[in-house]
């Protein structure tokens, strides 16, 4: 069997040159037994052969538990290259720690971990685990991960009472069969002979699941609900949050000391938000049912802290008392936000923000941030689906997105090079909207050291930061200004009488594409514009031996202009560069053009210029 399996993998590798295999998942079986909406049993068996140290990730095992999820069994058997059993581990030897740590977390989830990797390869693991759950909205099955793993046989089985409704979505590669016996329906899903899929950069967000199971009805700690529609799920969330909006008049007087009768909705929202930013502290609370159910507004106001649910509920309650319409909005936040299908209601949310309709001029509020201005969503929550919890139920909407010309970075740099090759760098910049989010300088106000920031965003090697000032301006069009002065002793490289240098010392700000071919469309979720002016002041009696050519490229997805001109007020040269690329989806047929566009920018950025003595 082992020789047969290795032969299959060898044939596969020959037909897929350049692809190495670090591990072979010989077999994986997942079985879900639905006893009731409050009782689920999940049994997972896996046999995996680990061939290289890179495949050791399969030997780093973990599972999590909380009030509603309990692991009943975890057994690991380790076999050496000869197939002999050399070790056995059970759940009692796993190390336990809190899933979330820190003063700003209140959570009952615990993670158990164990590393059973071995120094000698190959070796084989047989893993068996049994988990009991008390609730389930859905189940996504996606056992395929790394490109360098071969999967021989994968299967998923779910058995349930025949009258329990289940929405099933499968990948086209999946074999799906079903049976009905003694009022129990079983669905069987199978996939075999597959290599892991390499994820292409800047791709469309889509479901990564081979199989997705959505329970039409569910029971969460006694709260029964439905995923028949977004509306029904929103109604269930409303019930979960019912009677949590109580807030007394004394609290209202503290928020609006001068009254609110003469204020418009926007002004009322701003005062409420200012109060929350000033007086409330963010604490993540996911203990038990608190993972989905908010604390009461009055309790949050009195305690002075809350999680995203509680702070959003507090502001929503404040606005309700002053006759301003607002709705909590469930959202999948972060750069790795979940894929949401408008036609497939489910619970893929991990955060809550607030939506204030404001008579059609919608205001969005990130209630957990003490820095974000009113009506500005950063790249943490922008440009994605959110579920508004309206009195009529859930309503799926899209959060605002910003255009490429709004996410603007304008930077002015002067490089004064001495005859010894040292340089004095004067850098001034203004970042707007999401360009500010991408700027490393935003970390300065979080206490990061100046030298660390400079090393992160430049290729400078030996420098002293003489001055760094960062100012942020809060508004619905937020911006940040930076003033920087650096002395670098090794900016140039001396070769005979020449001084070699690269004027563009910024790094990692544009998309990079390595592969020569593309199988999926290219998707820029956000667009940006960068305008750089770099003045290079030559040392006395030196000049450039060759001036770079100007360049201008315009495409459907972006543009690039580079101009080179002599300075009139000093001995030197000015580089003016403008780069922009637009948000949007572009067909894979355009990949070569897009890759070439950014390759050209990268090549120009790395250009080596030479200063030589004047003749």
What are these regions (language model features)?
Residues 3-14, 315:
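Sec-dependent N-terminal signal peptides
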């Amino acid at each position: 069997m082992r020789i047969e399996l290795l032969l299959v993998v060898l044939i596969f590798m020959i037909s897929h040159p350049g692809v190495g295999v670090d591990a072979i998942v010989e077999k994986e079986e997942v079985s879900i037994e639905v006893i009731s909406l409050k009782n689920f049993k999940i049994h997972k068996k896996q046999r995996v052969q680990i061939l290289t140290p890179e495949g050791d990730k399969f030997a780093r095992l973990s599972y999590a538990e909380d009030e509603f999820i309990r692991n009943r069994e975890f057994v690991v058997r380790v076999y050496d290259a000869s197939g002999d059993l050399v070790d056995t581990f059970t759940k009692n030897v796993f190390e336990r720690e809190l899933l979330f740590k820190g003063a700003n977390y209140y959570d009952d989830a615990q993670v158990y971990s164990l590393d059973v990797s071995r120094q000698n390869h190959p070796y084989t693991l047989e893993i068996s685990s049994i988990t009991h759950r008390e609730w389930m909205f859905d189940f996504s099955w996606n056992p395929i991960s790394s490109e360098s793993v071969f999967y021989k046989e994968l299967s998923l089985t779910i058995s349930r009472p025949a009258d329990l409704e289940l929405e099933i979505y499968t990948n086209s590669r999946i074999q799906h069969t079903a049976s009905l016996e003694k009022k129990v329906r079983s669905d069987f899903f199978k996939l075999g002979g597959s290599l892991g899929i390499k994820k292409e950069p800047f791709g469309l967000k889509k479901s990564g699941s081979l199989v997705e199971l959505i329970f039409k009805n569910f029971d969460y700690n006694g709260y029964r609900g439905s995923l028949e529609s977004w509306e029904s799920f929103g109604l269930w969330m409303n019930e979960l949050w019912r009677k949590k909006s109580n807030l007394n008049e004394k609290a209202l007087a503290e928020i609006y000391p001068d009254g609110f009768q003469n204020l418009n909705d926007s002004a009322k929202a701003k005062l409420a938000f200012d109060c929350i930013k000033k007086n409330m502290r963010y604490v993540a609370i996911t203990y038990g049912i608190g993972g989905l159910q908010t604390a009461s507004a009055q309790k949050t106001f009195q305690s002075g802290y809350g999680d995203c649910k509680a702070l959003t509920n507090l502001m929503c309650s404040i606005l309700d008392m002053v006759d301003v319409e607002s709705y909590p909005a469930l959202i999948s936040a972060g750069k790795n936000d979940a894929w949401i299908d408008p036609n497939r209601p489910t619970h893929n949310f991990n955060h809550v923000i607030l939506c204030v309709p404001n008579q059609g001029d919608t205001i969005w509020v990130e209630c957990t941030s003490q820095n974000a201005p009113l009506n500005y969503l950063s790249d943490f929550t922008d440009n994605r689906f959110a579920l508004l919890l309206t009195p009529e139920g859930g309503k799926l909407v899209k959060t605002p997105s910003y255009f490429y010309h709004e996410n603007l970075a304008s930077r002015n740099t002067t490089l004064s090079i001495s005859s010894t090759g040292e340089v004095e760098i004067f850098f001034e910049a203004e970042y707007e909207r999401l360009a500010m989010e991408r700027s490393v300088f935003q970390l300065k106000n979080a206490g990061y050291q100046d030298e660390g920031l400079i090393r992160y965003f430049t290729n400078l090697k030996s420098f002293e930061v003489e001055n760094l000032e960062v100012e942020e301006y809060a508004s619905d069009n937020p911006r940040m200004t930076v003033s920087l002065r650096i002395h670098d002793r090794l900016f140039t490289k001396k070769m005979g009488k020449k001084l070699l240098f690269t004027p563009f010392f910024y790094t990692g700000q544009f998309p990079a594409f390595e592969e020569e071919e593309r199988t999926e469309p290219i998707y820029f979720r956000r667009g940006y514009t960068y305008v750089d002016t770099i003045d290079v002041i030559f040392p006395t009696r030196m000049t450039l031996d060759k001036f770079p050519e100007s360049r201008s490229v315009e495409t459907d997805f972006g543009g690039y202009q580079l101009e080179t001109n002599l300075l009139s007020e000093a001995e030197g040269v000015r580089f003016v560069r403008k780069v922009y690329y637009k948000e949007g989806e572009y067909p894979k047929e355009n990949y070569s053009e897009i890759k070439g566009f950014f390759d050209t920018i990268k090549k120009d950025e790395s250009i080596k210029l030479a200063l030589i003595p004047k003749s």
